[in-house]
Amino acid sequence: MSAVDAGEPAEADPRRHVSDYFRLERWELAGEDGGDRPTSVAGRTPVDPHQRGPGGGLRTGGLLTNLDSLGGFTSGLSVLPQWIVTTSLMATVSELAHIGPLRMRADVLRRGRNSVVTSLGVVDEGAGDRHVAAATMSCAVLDPGAMVLHFDRPFHQAMPEASPDPVRPDEFFCIEPGEGPVTRLRLEDRLRNPWGILHGGAVAMLADEAACRAAVAAAPAGFGPNGVAASDVVLHYLRPVKAGPVEARCEVLGRRAGRTTVRVAIHDVGSDDRVVTVGSVAVLAV
Amino acid sequence: MTFLGYPPAEHLLGDLGMAAEITSETTARVRTRATPQIASADGGVRAGVLATLVDVVGGAIAARVLRPDWMATADLALEVVGPVPGPWVEARGSLLRRGRTTLVVEALVVGVDEDGNDLVVDGRAPDPVAWASMTFAVLPTQDASSGGRPSPELPTRWAFSGGGLDLPVLEALPVTVLDGPAGRLSIPARPYLHNSFGAVQGGVVALLAEAAGAEALGAAQGRDASDMVVTDLQIAYLALAKVGPIVSSARVLATGTDGRAGAVVELHDAGAGHRLTTVVNVTAVPAEHFDPTVV
């Protein structure tokens, strides 16, 4: 289960750190029925230099974090007064070299009693609104309990200011340095979502980093001389991450024509090492 | 032989000759012969057929784990690793999680020999063919009346037998290309393609999306669809496709420098008010991209 980002003002909820790190602006689009159950929310992220990956654009884990935040928020708004947790995220990034900013749009496709399905599209405003990525996410509907979910409508959250002290994504997400098939993340409180569990975007960033390291470690010398980057990613959030540390264990399934397929299993080591997320990542030499 | 009376005598799954086996309470395997009728441009099995295979193996596991409840596929993702090295291709599925409302299954697809044994090529096991994952929505028994409620006695081994395919699988559906560059293709919702709900089977939906993506992505690159190899399918099943015809459309994403490109394919049930039934992210590359000298 991944993040919900309730969108509270930053000064009221320091747990908005993850979406603020990418300076994600969000605004609600008018619903078809004009009611208070919106089906579409837009977002924009500037792609700051320290967040770019070897592909030249926003690294895929960062893009997935933004999609998880935007799609989760959109899905949550659509089921108020209930809320959601992400259960699966399927994304394809067809262009890795973005100019930026990237503009995203989330549209609720199906809203059922137990689940919400949302589609997401990404265009590169700096490249003439070129379509660079698409994703579909599924969320489970849940009772928010005592959590207060109040938003001024129509919702708008301005783009946060740039940090005077930028840190790279792996450092921000507390991903420990290393190489090989196992990559570890320290679970610090600022990476938790309003439910107190690890933000789904952090899980995606860990999967990206771990799969890229595993692909490089398993490759012959000379593979990806300019680096590697994730493109197609599928993640099933099976259980919430509560304790940490979090470990991504990768299995390289095969490599063909510059593309490596990696199965990623993420474990919450402090919760009896249980499997929390399983997915696959396609890693490209760039 | 059928699984609880499914599929009918004349059915795509029978013509694909799939054979299934429950290997434990939470695992199963399903295989089909890799024939020219289901081959893609690189000589491997089409991604849409692989998706059909894993949908069947996932459904077999889900039916056993959930009994007496039933299920419907909510999403399916398939990533092709490489072409099939053997005469048969086999999906080996295992349960990842069983929740109150959903069930998640993963499947590894491998090549096997005539006896179902793992292949050995140059002294080692070849790379798998594909990895897949699926989410099933749990349908409590009282809601499952249209789905063919399973009996407590589920078979542990069965085979779908038919006359076999004597023409390419897309022609057997049949797929009609209405507007290739727009990814507008169509299939009828006929019993030959039905699932246990009387709607178009999830694997057939994958085949249509694969074909639509290849048409649109090929046209965007000035290529024929038959020159494109689909490597990834990410499918969200939103509603049953029951009336037909089922018509696709595609939006092409940016194309990478190596010709790798993506498209978002939508399927609508034209006979049901043009209802959106499925959204699929499709990734494809030109077949020439698979130069064996490239690592």
Range-by-range predicted roles:
Chain B
Residues 1-295:
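Terminal targeting signals and extreme-terminal segments of soluble enzymes
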